[in-house]
């Protein structure tokens, strides 16, 4: 993935200023960074319907991957820290994300920029205890502990790029009632009986094309239709099909 074409390089647009409700989260996120000079990302998930403040680029790329993943039911990008009892001591631990899949399994994820080298001998016990605490906390959620690094997201370069495009439409239309537009999209696809180009679909439905696009992307998140978000850059020529 080149620096020029990476999702981070493409994220140049300015979003809305954070509301007073988010200021506390922003200040807390600044504190969480400690001495690490990582980026802060104020994001809105149209899928979950809430804002989050993410404390690093890896967390942001992870969000772009999960926001439109058809296999995911829901996710929490800022789970509360937990206290687990381990070897007769209380240990505080936390995850960067908890992801629930449609097939019922759960992943409690820790996100790192890159793989860490083996700990020094004096740190090995601490690292082992921390990993054990993560495993215990994950079992509380009925899930498994998963560690991911930025390189894990490279195969999803197109999905992340397309997520940025789709999120701009969803953010612009988040206060619009799109139920009737979604119904019109579904009716048009049923009548067609075959995949329809995105721009042709918008023309058939009528009204504001940007709202039709937003309705299509909402339906994608709900698995009510399909788009080739992992295999090509989405444009007006992209084919919208029935759900798989």
Model-predicted regions and their roles:
Residues 1-244:
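Electrostatic, structured charged patches in enzyme active sites and in nucleic-acid/phosphate-binding
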